[in-house]
């Protein structure tokens, strides 16, 4: 049997028959009882699929989403091809029931009525919160690893993340707060990055100061041009591709850099910008560590010249 890893696939022995019964409590206090490791798993969102491919073998997926096969937004395109059945990114209760899963993992972003309807079918449903920081991401890895009976593998994934984070800390840890570069990130909807969002934690852990948070941006809002000017970022971060809204990301970048009202901004004057794929900017899986390392390397390339 084969199990996915971040760099490919690796052989391992999977002895489900010897597994004892166990139970797991999800983020909402629901107790899930297992007689054996689940073998027909359905994940309701891409970030959970990204985790699962490093936890279980392809034949333990009952299906995988079309999103997982889209290299613009997915970090697991190659691994996802090993799952036989492909379904749309969001499917209804009846379609999930027809898959006959023995474990359904959904995120709280699906509405309560949908989740309740899933539970009413008798399916085993695990509900997870949307991670907004590294601790929440790693806690979710722990709980999902336990649910699929792969706690040891989950522990290793977290250890691997921490090794990457330690590399970043060794490079940027000694930079005084006031000397850290200020960055402002753009989506097609505008400058974003509230202090309560996942990107803020990615930004800060990479050694940057999040300009949107410094300007007091609230969750769900976008930063005004006046705030961008007063924050005066050293770096602008643009998307390589937008997973959230249709539009021309190249035109977005050109419009911002040529905007007359932004010409006093350091990042605009110096044409100092970074382009990062959405699959990293919003990474809520083990790949959050990769996103932090990638952003840090692009923001402070001089610190990584010998790596």
In which residue ranges do the predicted regions lie?
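Short helices/loops that flank or line small-molecule/ion binding pockets
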Residues: 91-101, 120, 223-232
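A short, structured surface patch at a secondary-structure boundary
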Residues: 43-99, 103-108, 208-211
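Short helix-initiation/N-cap motifs at beta->coil->alpha
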Residues: 27-29, 83-94, 131, 216-225
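Alpha-helical, coiled-coil/dimerization segments enriched in small aliphatic residues
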Residues: 70, 192-220
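Bacterial Sec-exported substrate-binding components of ABC uptake systems
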Residues: 4-50, 152-183, 298-307
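Short secondary-structure boundary segments
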Residues: 45, 108-109, 130, 239-243, ...
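Structured C-terminal subdomain patch of bacterial secreted/periplasmic proteins
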Residues: 141-148, 152-155, 159, 240-307
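Extracytoplasmic ligand-binding site segments that recognize negatively charged/polar headgroups
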Residues: 113-114, 129-143, 177-201
């Amino acid at each position: 049997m084969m199990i996915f890893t971040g760099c490919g696939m690796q052989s391992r022995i999977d002895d489900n028959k010897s597994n004892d019964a166990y139970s797991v409590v999800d983020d909402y206090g629901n107790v899930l009882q297992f007689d054996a490791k689940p073998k027909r798993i359905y994940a309701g969102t891409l970030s959970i699929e990204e985790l699962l491919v490093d936890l279980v073998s392809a034949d333990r997926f009952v299906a995988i989403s079309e999103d997982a096969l889209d290299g613009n937004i997915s970090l697991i395109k190659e691994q996802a091809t090993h799952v036989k059945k492909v379904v749309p990114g969001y499917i209804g209760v009846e379609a999930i029931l027809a898959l006959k899963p023995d474990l359904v993992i959904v995120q709280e972003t699906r509405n309560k009525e949908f989740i309740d309807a899933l539970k009413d079918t008798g399916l085993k449903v695990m509900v997870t919160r949307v991670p907004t920081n590294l601790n929440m991401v790693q806690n979710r890895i722990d709980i999902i690893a336990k649910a699929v009976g792969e706690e040891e593998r989950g522990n290793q994934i977290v250890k691997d993340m921490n090794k990457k984070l330690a590399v970043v800390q060794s490079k940027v840890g000694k930079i005084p707060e006031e000397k850290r570069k200020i960055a402002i990130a753009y989506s097609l909807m505008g400058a974003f990055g509230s202090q309560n969002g996942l990107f803020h934690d990615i930004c800060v852990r990479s050694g940057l100061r999040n300009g949107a948070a410094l300007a007091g941006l609230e969750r769900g809002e976008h930063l005004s041009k006046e705030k961008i000017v007063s924050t005066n970022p050293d770096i602008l971060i643009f998307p390589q591709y937008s997973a959230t809204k249709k539009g021309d990301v190249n035109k977005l970048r050109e419009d911002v850099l040529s905007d007359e009202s932004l010409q006093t901004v350091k990042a605009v004057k110096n044409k100092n910008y970074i382009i990062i794929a959405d699959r990293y900017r919003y990474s809520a899986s083990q790949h959050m560590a990769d996103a932090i390392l990638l952003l840090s390397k692009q923001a402070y390339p001089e610190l990584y010249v010998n790596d």
